[in-house]
Design a protein with these regions (language model features):
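Active-site beta-strand/loop signature of hydrolases that rely on acidic residues for catalysis
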Residues: 3-7, 22-40, 102, 131-154, ...
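Short, acidic/polar
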Residues: 12-23
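Structured beta-strand-rich core segments of catalytic domains in phosphoester-bond hydrolases
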Residues: 35-38, 42-112
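Metal-dependent phosphoesterases centered on the DNase I-like endonuclease/exonuclease/phosphatase
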Residues: 50-51, 126-217
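Conserved beta strand-loop-helix elements of the APE1-like EEP
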Residues: 61-75, 196, 208-229, 255
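Acidic carboxylate-rich catalytic motifs and surrounding loops in phosphoryl-/glycosyl-chemistry enzymes
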Residues: 79-81, 187-197, 233-237
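Surface-exposed cleft-lining segments at the edges of enzyme active sites
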Residues: 82-83, 108-125, 161-166
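Surface polyanion/phosphate-binding segment centered on an Asp-His-Pro turn
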Residues: 234-257
């Protein structure tokens, strides 16, 4: 089973890129972030035409998450991260597909830091830690994937010295990610490639993609049920080079049946 995560940076504006990627790479499940579209503007018919069912949680102009599947019914569990009923940003959706609990998330950016946006990010992270612990306690396979807006280590960022005070790399943020790992979750990419330079995001400016000046901020966290089934993982870097592509590249894992 192949599961992918892709921050599409506007699902309608990048629809040709998304559909081409789905056709060429054929993930069984695809988790999308940054739809930047209200619920009624999600291109469901085009997605359906590509062979996928979908659930989504949209928001006008900002955020938005979706889960696509071509391998089974999508049973929606949640469409908001528990812990703050006043949080109306569309950043979280959770579902069961073929016996796997799949979480698709778009963690806040947090810049500028310090400030209210950074406080929101850290609060969101704390809520995620609480819910992740509950998910970990379930005796079922669970994956938490998406755009975490965190580079966990210096290996995950081009020229880390330039990012010391950024909300994606501040010590508090990296510590929060490591607290998730400490619960027992496996960072899928790092399990298979512990020492490789791997990036998933390349800024549109300064030819970042051409220079391989990137960040690794899109992650798969697996519980032990899925950790033992992990057979492959990677980044579809070539997609980032397509015309009118997102500034993220799709990331994927492959699980043994």
């Amino acid at each position: 089973m192949k599961i992918a995560t892709y921050n599409v940076n506007g699902v309608n504006g990048r629809l040709p890129v998304l559909l081409r990627w789905l056709e060429e790479n054929k993930p069984d499940v695809a988790c999308l972030q940054e739809l930047k579209a209200p619920h009624e503007k999600f291109p469901f018919q085009a997605i359906k035409g590509a062979g996928y069912n979908a659930i989504w949680h949209g928001q006008k102009s900002w955020n938005g998450v979706a889960i696509l599947s071509k391998v089974g019914k999508i049973e929606e569990i949640k469409r908001a991260l528990p812990g703050d009923e006043e949080d109306v940003q569309s950043r979280y959706i959770e579902a069961n597909i073929n016996g796997i609990r799949i979480v698709c998330l778009y963690l806040p950016n947090g810049n500028p830091a310090p400030g209210p946006k950074f406080d929101y990010k850290m609060g969101w992270f704390k809520r995620l830690q609480v819910h992740a612990k509950e998910l970990y306690a379930l005796n079922i396979p669970v994956v938490i994937c998406g755009d975490y807006n965190v580079m966990p280590t210096e290996l995950d960022v081009y020229k880390p010295e330039r990012w010391v005070d950024d909300a994606l790399f501040r010590p508090e943020v990296r510590a929060a990610f490591n607290e998730l790992i400490a619960q027992g979750w496996t960072d899928a990419i790092r399990k298979l490639y512990p020492n490789d330079t791997i990036y998933t995001f390349f800024d549109y400016f300064r030819n970042a993609y051409v220079r391989n000046a990137g960040l690794r901020i899109d992650h798969f966290l697996l519980n032990p049920h899925l950790d033992k089934r992990l057979v492959a993982a990677g980044v579809d870097l070539n997609v980032r080079g397509w015309e009118k592509s997102s500034d993220h590249a799709p990331v994927w894992i492959e699980l043994a049946d």
